[in-house]
C-alpha cells in the first residue's frame, strides 16, 4: 500500500486550491498529535472523513475492494502522510552529493553518517531530536542543513577524547531484558593519544605479566651454596658440638670431601649401621654437659661417636631446618619430636629411659583425671528457674537446708522457731553479770537461782547438746554446775559454758605429727580417737560443755567464756590452765583446747563417770 502511494507529485500539485483544502483538512489532526507519529499504528491509512463510506467486510478473499466515492482523493501525494517539519529522508543522489561535498580532513571530527530513514528507522528514532531541528519542506534544504555550522559549546580536543572514551567504556544498563551484561573494561593505551592503533584492555595486559618465565639455571647455581650452609649449620646451633669438634675438624673435612666426591644418597640408617652407633647415642652426646671429660675417659668411643654425629647431623637435621625455616616455628613437625627427645634427664643413656618418661607422664595425667572425676558431684536437682536453688544457710538460726525440698523446709521452720525462742533473752530483774564487753556481756546462772533463770539455762544446754552430738543425760553433779551465758547486743544467747567441780583428770598423750596426704583419709586425722594416760592428775574445774552459735564463731566468744570461768569459778582464786580439764572433746573442741592451753597434752575427764 505504501510503495504504490509514495510518488512525488507535480510541481503545481501543491498550488492547486482544491488540494490545499484537502491537505489542510487532513494535516490538521496530524499536527495536533505529532508526538505519536513513531507508533506503528499511525503509519496506516489517514483518518477517514464523514464523506467516506464505511468499509464493508468482504464475503470472499478474491472479491475486489469497493471503489472510492470521489476520484480526486486518489491524486494525494505520499508527503501528506508525514509531518512536513521532518524531511530527513535523503535520496541516493543527495547522499552522494553530501559525501563528495564534505572535506576529507573533517572525517575524524564529523558525526557518524545517518542511515536512510525508512518506516522502521522512524519508529526507533526519538521524538526529541525532531523538535530541535526544524527544516524546510523542500528537499534541497536538507543539503544546506548539513553544511551550516551549528553553534556548540567550546571544548578542547582532550575533553572530546576523554568524553568519547568514557562513552565507550560505560556499559549499557538494561532493566527489561534478563541477560547479564559483562563488566566494563578500562581502555588504556593509544586511545588517549589520538593514534590509529587499536586500544588494549588493562585486564589483558595484567594477565600476561603474571606468568613468569621459567628459569632452570638457578637450582644448579644455589646447590653448592646450600651444601656449604649445611656443613656450618650444626656448629652454629649446638655449642656442645662446636666445643668438641674443634679437635677433629680436619677429619670432618675429609669425610665431607668424600661425600661430595661420591654424592651417593645414603640414609641415616645406613650410616648408623656402617659405624655401629644408634640414634640414641647421638642424642645423649647432644645433651651432655661436660663433653670434654667424656672424651678423656673413653677416647676410642668418643671418636667414633663424634664421626657419626658429624655425618648424620648435617645431612639430616640441618636439611630439615633449612626446609622448615620458611615456615613459622609453631607449625613445624620436627620441633615437637626434638622436644620429646630432649626431655629425659642428662644421666640417662639407655633407650628404655628415653621412652619411659612419656609413659610416666601419661600415667600421671590419667590419675589426675580420675581424681578430678571423683571430686566432681553429680547434679541431682533440676534447675527449673527457682528463686532459691540448692543448699541455703539460714542467717538467723544457721541451719543448712535445701529450699526446694518440702521436708527440709518443714524441718527448718520447726527448728528455726524453737531455736529463736530458746536463744532469745528478754532480761531478768536480778542478772548476775560477771563480765562485760563492747559486743555483749556474760551472765552466770547458779542452781539456786529462780526457775526462769535455771529453765533458760537448761534450754540453751539442750541446744548445745544437740549440736555437739551428746545424748540428753543429766550432769554428774547438777547441784554444783555453773552455767555461763554470753549475751550479745541484740539480746541473743550466742555462747554457753557449763563448768563443774572435779578432783582429777588425765593428760592426753602426744602423738607424732605425720605429713598429711589430702588425697587419702589423713585429712580426717582430727576426727580420730585420742588416747590419754592412766596416771591421774589434780584438776579443780571441769568444762562439761562449751558451745558457740555458728554465726558468731571466730570472734573470741569461747575464749572470753573460759577466761571468765577461770576467774569466777572459785571465790577468791584464779585458776591456771593446768587446773582445768575438758570432758570428751569433739574434734573442734580438741583443736580449741590445744590452742587455748598452748599444748596438745591438755587434761581431759569423763563427765559421765
Curated annotation (Swiss-Prot):
Residues 13-22, 41-54, 345-355 have a biased composition (Polar residues). It is found in: Nucleus; Chromosome. Its EC number is 2.3.1.-. Residues 126-135 have a biased composition (Basic residues). It catalyses: L-lysyl-[protein] + acetyl-CoA = N(6)-acetyl-L-lysyl-[protein] + CoA + H(+). Its main location: nucleus. This is N-acetyltransferase ESCO2. The gene is esco2. The keyword Repressor does not apply. InterPro entries: AcTrfase_ESCO_Znf_dom, ESCO_Acetyltransf_dom. One of its GO terms (molecular function) is acetyltransferase activity.
